[in-house]
Amino acid sequence: MSSSQDKQSKWDSVKRYKLNKMISKLGNITGHGTELVTVYIPPRRPIYDIVSQLKNEAGTASNIKSDLTRNHVQDALSRTVEHLKLYKEPPENGLVIFCGAIPTGKGIGTEKIEIYSVVPPKAVQINLYRCDDHFWIDHLKDMMKDDKVIGILSLDTQEAGFGILTGDRWE
């Protein structure tokens, strides 16, 4: 069994179910403004780089005109920085953090800052920071897709072509 298959076997059906449920929950959350922070951290990216970037973004967030949105973004960023202090380095597959002011009732002012941290089933390939009215879950959804390898062979009387299809990627 190869090492990638061994790593994948660690993600049993219960973990996969819980992560799919969390992705579904996060996908249904929308903020009142650009109050929801998404951070994807690759496995070899130093945590202090991400902390520095987020502190810089917190300074930039002070320019947001709406008091409520500014406070929510700054609170989410500071909560994310505090959460990252729990790690000396990213986990083996990287880390994905979702944090923001999530509405608990109807109307503005009912939001509560919540944070969700995920160690994905596959290595995070991108370094991403987004502050938006929704969480950026597409990359995490892609990691959850089945990635069986399919070989495709096309024969003609004069030529032949071979390709490999892995998930939704063609080589």
Where are the model-predicted features located?
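Gly/Thr-rich phosphate-binding beta-strand-loop-beta motif of the actin/hexokinase/Hsp70
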Residues: 146-170
